[in-house]
Amino acid sequence: MLSDRQLWHAHNFETIVTATLNAYKAGCSPSSLSEELMELAAAQGFADYMVPGFEHGIGMIGDEWRIGMNDGPIPYWTNPDHIYQENEMVICAMQYACPEEDIGFRYENPILITKDGCEYMSKFPLKIEVIE
Protein backbone atom coordinates (compact mmCIF):
# COMPACT_ATOMS: atom_id res chain seq x y z
CA MET A 1 0.00 0.00 0.00
CA LEU A 2 1.38 3.37 -1.00
CA SER A 3 1.41 6.17 1.50
CA ASP A 4 0.06 9.63 0.79
CA ARG A 5 3.67 10.85 0.91
CA GLN A 6 4.78 8.38 -1.78
CA LEU A 7 1.88 9.45 -3.98
CA TRP A 8 2.85 13.09 -3.35
CA HIS A 9 6.36 12.38 -4.65
CA ALA A 10 4.99 10.51 -7.67
CA HIS A 11 2.61 13.36 -8.47
CA ASN A 12 5.47 15.87 -8.18
CA PHE A 13 7.52 13.90 -10.67
CA GLU A 14 4.65 13.56 -13.11
CA THR A 15 4.03 17.32 -12.80
CA ILE A 16 7.65 18.30 -13.49
CA VAL A 17 8.07 15.89 -16.42
CA THR A 18 4.86 17.15 -18.03
CA ALA A 19 5.90 20.78 -17.50
CA THR A 20 9.34 20.05 -18.95
CA LEU A 21 7.98 18.43 -22.09
CA ASN A 22 5.59 21.36 -22.51
CA ALA A 23 8.44 23.88 -22.11
CA TYR A 24 10.79 22.54 -24.80
CA LYS A 25 10.77 24.49 -28.07
CA ALA A 26 13.16 26.12 -30.50
CA GLY A 27 14.57 29.34 -29.06
CA CYS A 28 14.88 28.31 -25.41
CA SER A 29 18.07 27.11 -23.69
CA PRO A 30 18.97 24.50 -21.04
CA SER A 31 19.51 27.37 -18.58
CA SER A 32 16.14 28.98 -19.24
CA LEU A 33 14.39 25.61 -18.97
CA SER A 34 16.15 24.83 -15.71
CA GLU A 35 15.30 28.22 -14.22
CA GLU A 36 11.62 27.96 -15.17
CA LEU A 37 11.24 24.37 -13.99
CA MET A 38 13.16 24.76 -10.74
CA GLU A 39 10.93 27.75 -9.94
CA LEU A 40 7.91 25.49 -10.46
CA ALA A 41 9.45 22.80 -8.23
CA ALA A 42 10.22 25.39 -5.53
CA ALA A 43 6.71 26.83 -5.65
CA GLN A 44 5.26 23.35 -5.17
CA GLY A 45 7.72 22.38 -2.44
CA PHE A 46 9.85 19.72 -4.09
CA ALA A 47 12.88 21.56 -5.51
CA ASP A 48 15.19 19.86 -2.98
CA TYR A 49 14.44 16.51 -4.63
CA MET A 50 15.21 17.59 -8.20
CA VAL A 51 18.54 17.21 -9.97
CA PRO A 52 18.52 20.52 -11.91
CA GLY A 53 19.34 19.17 -15.36
CA PHE A 54 16.75 18.35 -17.98
CA GLU A 55 18.57 16.92 -21.00
CA HIS A 56 21.59 15.17 -22.40
CA GLY A 57 22.82 14.28 -25.85
CA ILE A 58 21.97 11.14 -27.73
CA GLY A 59 25.30 9.94 -29.05
CA MET A 60 26.91 10.49 -32.42
CA ILE A 61 24.05 12.63 -33.75
CA GLY A 62 21.71 15.05 -32.09
CA ASP A 63 23.26 17.58 -29.74
CA GLU A 64 26.70 15.98 -29.27
CA TRP A 65 28.30 18.29 -31.85
CA ARG A 66 28.09 21.05 -29.24
CA ILE A 67 30.49 19.17 -26.99
CA GLY A 68 33.05 18.94 -29.78
CA MET A 69 32.89 22.68 -30.37
CA ASN A 70 32.26 23.62 -26.75
CA ASP A 71 32.15 27.32 -26.09
CA GLY A 72 30.64 27.12 -22.62
CA PRO A 73 32.02 27.69 -19.15
CA ILE A 74 32.55 24.01 -18.26
CA PRO A 75 35.12 21.99 -20.28
CA TYR A 76 33.61 19.01 -22.15
CA TRP A 77 30.06 19.97 -21.19
CA THR A 78 27.40 21.43 -23.42
CA ASN A 79 27.09 25.19 -23.06
CA PRO A 80 24.03 25.61 -20.80
CA ASP A 81 23.10 28.82 -22.62
CA HIS A 82 23.07 27.43 -26.15
CA ILE A 83 19.78 27.97 -27.96
CA TYR A 84 17.77 24.95 -29.07
CA GLN A 85 17.18 24.85 -32.80
CA GLU A 86 14.20 23.47 -34.67
CA ASN A 87 14.78 19.80 -35.63
CA GLU A 88 17.44 19.30 -32.94
CA MET A 89 17.18 16.05 -30.99
CA VAL A 90 18.04 15.60 -27.32
CA ILE A 91 17.11 13.23 -24.54
CA CYS A 92 14.71 14.78 -22.06
CA ALA A 93 16.32 13.33 -18.93
CA MET A 94 15.17 13.99 -15.39
CA GLN A 95 15.99 12.72 -11.94
CA TYR A 96 14.05 13.12 -8.70
CA ALA A 97 15.46 11.66 -5.51
CA CYS A 98 14.46 11.68 -1.86
CA PRO A 99 17.01 9.29 -0.29
CA GLU A 100 15.78 9.81 3.26
CA GLU A 101 12.42 8.35 2.19
CA ASP A 102 13.88 5.68 -0.13
CA ILE A 103 12.05 7.02 -3.17
CA GLY A 104 13.20 8.36 -6.50
CA PHE A 105 12.31 8.49 -10.16
CA ARG A 106 14.13 8.82 -13.47
CA TYR A 107 12.69 9.72 -16.86
CA GLU A 108 14.37 9.63 -20.27
CA ASN A 109 12.70 10.20 -23.61
CA PRO A 110 14.26 11.20 -26.93
CA ILE A 111 12.57 14.34 -28.24
CA LEU A 112 12.64 16.31 -31.45
CA ILE A 113 12.64 20.06 -30.85
CA THR A 114 10.04 21.81 -32.99
CA LYS A 115 9.26 25.46 -33.59
CA ASP A 116 6.48 25.49 -31.00
CA GLY A 117 7.24 22.50 -28.78
CA CYS A 118 8.66 19.03 -29.06
CA GLU A 119 7.71 15.62 -30.38
CA TYR A 120 8.27 12.65 -28.08
CA MET A 121 9.88 9.63 -29.70
CA SER A 122 8.55 7.30 -27.00
CA LYS A 123 4.89 6.53 -27.49
CA PHE A 124 4.40 5.24 -23.95
CA PRO A 125 2.32 7.66 -21.88
CA LEU A 126 3.63 9.09 -18.64
CA LYS A 127 1.27 8.06 -15.86
CA ILE A 128 1.29 6.80 -12.31
CA GLU A 129 0.10 3.22 -11.94
CA VAL A 130 -0.29 1.69 -8.51
CA ILE A 131 0.06 -2.08 -8.65
CA GLU A 132 -1.14 -3.94 -5.59
Question: What do the predicted segments below correspond to?
Answer:
Residues 1-132:
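Active-site neighborhoods and metal-handling regions in enzymes and metal-associated proteins
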